[in-house]
Regions:
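Short, hydrophobic/π-rich interface segment
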Residues: 49-77
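Conserved mixed alpha/beta catalytic, RNA-binding, or beta-rich assembly cores of soluble enzyme
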Residues: 13-41, 55-59, 63
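Long, polar low-complexity intrinsically disordered regions
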Residues: 1-9
């Protein structure tokens, strides 16, 4: 398992995949597809240019995994503020993926 990949549960029905700049694309794509198969919905969060780059590539690869089952994704990007170190607020991008 990629040590830079975090899958967290926000509540009973919602999972968020947190991507860093060092996250492996293939592993992230597999995690996205796995969560998507379970609940037809997943959030991918990335903060920083490298993390966003890795997240976008992983979403593209996950889309090809999901397409094999005759499904396609809608990707809705948005921004959130998260608390970083020393109480600094960091802006992150959240990609919300759902069925078309």
């Amino acid at each position: 398992m990629d040590r830079n990949l975090f899958v967290d549960k926000e509540d009973d029905d919602d999972r968020i995949i947190r991507v860093t700049g060092g996250t492996e694309v293939q592993g992230t794509a597999s995690a996205i597809a796995s969560v998507f198969y379970e609940q037809n919905y997943v959030k991918v969060q990335a903060a920083g240019a490298q993390a966003v780059n890795q997240a976008v590539k992983a979403i593209a690869v996950a889309r090809s995994y999901i397409a094999v089952r005759g499904m396609d994704l809608i990707v809705r990007p948005g921004f959130i503020n998260i608390e970083g170190r020393d109480n600094q607020t960091i802006s992150a991008i959240v990609f919300r993926l759902s069925l078309t």
